[in-house]
Swiss-Prot record:
InterPro entries: Pet100. It is found in: Membrane; Mitochondrion; Mitochondrion inner membrane. The chain crosses the membrane at residues 7-24. The gene is PET100. Its main location: membrane. This is Protein PET100 homolog, mitochondrial. GO terms for cellular component: mitochondrial inner membrane. Plays a role in mitochondrial complex IV assembly.
């Protein structure tokens, strides 16, 4: 009984990881679950999003220049 049980346990220990790797590496499964989930979490950028970022950078740059100009005028 003990030897048969050990052989059964060893078979399960070896079969389970191999089966999980085989299932997880299926291309259809990967596309359906992983890629789709990634698209849900991080949707593609909108067309106007990069422009908004550039506008924000420009506003910050102008504010910084104005601050430096005021500081230079006050110190002289």
């Amino acid at each position: 009984m003990g030897v048969k049980l050990e052989v059964f346990r060893m078979t399960i220990y070896l079969t389970f990881p191999v089966a999980m790797f085989w299932i997880a590496n299926q291309a259809e499964w990967f596309e359906d679950y992983v890629i789709q989930r990634k698209r849900e979490l991080w949707p593609p950028e909108k067309e106007d999003q990069p422009q908004e970022l550039e506008d924000f950078k420009e506003r910050i740059r102008k504010q910084r220049e104005e601050r430096l100009l005021r500081a230079a005028q006050q110190s002289s």
